[in-house]
Amino acid sequence: MYDSTPTIVVQDSVLADDLCQYIITFTKDAGPKPNLIASNGKNIRDEMRTSNGIGMDFGEDAVIDTIYKSMSEMCHLPISHAEPISIQRYRPGEEYKPHWDAFVHNEDLPKTIRLEECGNRAVTIIGCLNDSDAATVFPHLGLGIQSMQGRVIMFGNLDEDKEPHPLSMHMGTTPREGEKWIFTLWFREKPFMKTEKTLSKKKSEKKSTERHFDPDKHAANVMKKAKEMMKERGAMPI
């Protein structure tokens, strides 16, 4: 979780094609909205991230819940440490400017961040839902990772002192043609959601919208890819 050099893992063919399409269709039907940030007691459009998207809590859709589970297992952090998943659509001209995902402790943060209670964003996971000429770029590392359907990008955000790692700065470039679709999950150092027991109960009470693939088969595929990844490259440092 804490490292002198950011651990960046890229693994292809993790997300099934029909799962990616399900998430895109689900988000289109929900109606992507501009990203907002709190400023002086008001919500204003985020000029850093000009894409449109939606956020979803665990338990709102059984299919998307499989993403929480599989990504949790991949980064070795409990589902309860995850923030709500963010699903974003980027069109030409839309981008996410260079930024750090981790919070700075002396910043004037909204109370909803709950930094002291829940800790910082230790791990970020980006799932690529379609092929695009856009990329996730780490400027200080000279690294660009193109968006390819099924690809998962996972990286640590904190250094050995549990502070935002300078080299973890990254950006989402704009597509020259078409759209870029991704989801992002941030995992905190400590639980951010309700207890696992409550989450499991909530999940069991929810019914998914119509699905076009087998989520159990998808979960098995993700775990197979995760084991291959960890055998070849090692797990995220804990």
Protein language model features and the residues they cover:
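Fe(II)/2-oxoglutarate oxygenase catalytic core
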Residues: 1-238
